[in-house]
């Protein structure tokens, strides 16, 4: 048995220049695992707590408290634990914190240790991370949801919807699917430049132009897909992030106030006009009646993803399944705080025929853990931004590496 011999953490920077936690775990055989924790901008109110210092450093965004919690409180408790018993480790972290949202230790502290331990254990066995976490059944390369036009909280522009994505279904390999996205992305840049729009990038590497409304980005994507020659092989996905513009019971966008019913009808119209295959957070996280109506209306036609609605929380997802809200769940490990809790949520979803989408955060790093994690859990889909910015391409490049060992791409089977 190999045990955890040393744990340490320190501040590093995420892709927005904000501090985040990097954790390193050393095992008794000398194997080392490290992990960098991401951070979100558009966050659900029920997410696990990201502990910040709230002092003068970095405008209050320092994470020295979380770092100290790893180096002192957590290290004292987990030294000597079996490195291969991830469940025991993660349950220990949860019990040590003593809350249901990691408000004492910080989910950025616990997740860093959880991820780093998994990496160290995989290294000790000489196994790739996806194989260690997923076993022999980890074999499916996910279909990417590539966010190539950014709006909402991820960009400084006038577009309400947060992400306009393309999904390459009609391909037999991940590398060919990714190639199609690269070509569409390049054409989009030219289209924007030629029409006098900004080609500045948002947080997730997508372009962030000012556009007339929330339909114009979709028209742009359709034009680029056609010019690239990928009609009927690439579809559209949206992350509306509607909680961000929900106030006083109405959805405020494009200078108007929409009721839940009116916004649902807007989605119905969009789905009739465009090849939209997925809508994420189409309604606000607490608009439960609206979610039920949305699912009744579109749930048998397209994928309806709950992000803020479910926050990767097994108990909240279970309640949503019972109430028939959405038919898919976004998976963000830092919303829940440990690898084990993330895996439990994925398994609950899969048992109930809810699809899963592994996801990055808008504040990311070069850490490509979620690429392995998506393959390990056979989520079938991954969101990790545009084909730009190193923290985004790190995940795509890791998936290309994995494809050499495991070449089943879900594509048309999804």
UniProtKB/Swiss-Prot annotation:
Q: Does the keyword Secreted apply?
A: yes
Query: Gene3D superfamilies given for it?
Result: Enolase-like C-terminal domain, Enolase-like, N-terminal domain
Q: Where is the active site?
A: 204, 332
EC class (word): lyase
Predominant place of localization: cytoplasm
Top-rank taxon of the source lineage equals Bacteria
Q: Kindly list the cofactors needed.
A: Mg(2+)
Q: Which InterPro entries match?
A: Enolase, Enolase-like_C_sf, Enolase-like_N, Enolase_C, Enolase_CS, Enolase_N
Q: Which amino acids does the record list as binding (2R)-2-phosphoglycerate?
A: 162, 332, 361-362, 383
Asked whether the UniProt record includes Metal-binding among its keywords, one would answer: yes
Pathway(s) served? Carbohydrate degradation; glycolysis; pyruvate from D-glyceraldehyde 3-phosphate: step 4/5
Q: By its UniProt entry, which Pfam families does this protein fall under?
A: Enolase_C, Enolase_N
Q: Offer one example of a GO biological process linked to this entry.
A: glycolytic process
E.C. no:
4.2.1.11
List the catalytic activities from the record: (2R)-2-phosphoglycerate = phosphoenolpyruvate + H2O
CDD domains per UniProt: enolase
Alphabetically ordered keywords of this record: Cytoplasm, Glycolysis, Lyase, Magnesium, Metal-binding, Secreted
> Where located?
Cytoplasm; Secreted; Cell surface
State any GO CC term.
cell surface
Mind listing the GO molecular function terms for this protein? magnesium ion binding; phosphopyruvate hydratase activity
As for family, the record states:
Belongs to the enolase family.
Classification via NCBIfam families: eno
Task: Tell me what this protein is called.
Answer: Enolase
């Amino acid at each position: 048995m190999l045990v955890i011999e040393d744990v340490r953490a320190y501040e590093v920077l995420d892709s927005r220049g904000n501090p985040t936690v990097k954790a390193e775990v050393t095992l008794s055989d000398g194997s080392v695992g490290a992990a960098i924790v991401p951070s979100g901008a558009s966050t659900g109110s029920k997410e696990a707590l990201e502990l910040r210092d709230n002092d003068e450093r970095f405008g209050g965004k320092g994470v020295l408290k979380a770092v100290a919690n790893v180096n002192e409180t957590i290290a004292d408790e987990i030294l000597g634990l079996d490195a291969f018993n991830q469940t025991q480790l993660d349950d220990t972290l949860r019990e040590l914190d003593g809350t249901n949202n990691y408000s004492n230790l910080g989910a950025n502290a616990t997740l860093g240790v959880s991820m780093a331990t998994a990496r160290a254990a995989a290294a000790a066995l000489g196994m790739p991370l996806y194989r260690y976490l997923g076993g022999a059944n980890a074999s499916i390369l996910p279909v990417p949801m590539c966010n190539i036009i950014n709006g909402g909280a991820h960009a400084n522009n006038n577009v309400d919807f947060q992400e306009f994505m393309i999904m390459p279904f009609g391909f037999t390999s991940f590398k060919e699917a990714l190639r199609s996205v690269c070509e569409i992305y390049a054409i989009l840049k030219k289209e924007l430049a030629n029409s006098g729009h900004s080609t500045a990038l948002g947080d997730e590497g997508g372009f962030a132009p000012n556009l007339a409304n929330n339909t114009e980005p979709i028209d742009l994507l359709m034009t680029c897909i056609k010019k690239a020659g990928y009609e009927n092989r690439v579809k559209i996905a949206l992350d509306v992030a509607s909680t961000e513009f929900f106030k006083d019971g109405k959805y405020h966008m494009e200078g108007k106030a929409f009721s839940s019913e009116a916004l649902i009808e807007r989605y119905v119209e969009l789905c009739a006009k465009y090849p939209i295959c997925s809508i994420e957070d189409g309604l606000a996280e607490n608009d439960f009646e609206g979610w039920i109506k949305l699912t009744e209306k579109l749930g048998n036609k397209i994928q309806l993803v709950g992000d803020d609605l479910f926050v990767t929380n097994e108990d909240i997802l279970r309640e949503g399944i019972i109430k028939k809200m959405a038919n898919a769940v976004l998976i963000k490990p830092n919303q829940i705080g440990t690898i084990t809790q993330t895996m439990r949520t994925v398994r609950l979803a899969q048992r109930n025929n809810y699809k899963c989408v592994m996801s990055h955060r808008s504040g990311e790093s070069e850490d490509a853990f979620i690429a392995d994690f998506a393959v390990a859990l056979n989520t079938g889909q991954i969101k990790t931004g545009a084909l730009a910015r190193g923290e985004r391409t790190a995940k795509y490049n890791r998936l290309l590496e994995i494809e050499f060992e495991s070449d089943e791409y879900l594509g048309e089977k999804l």
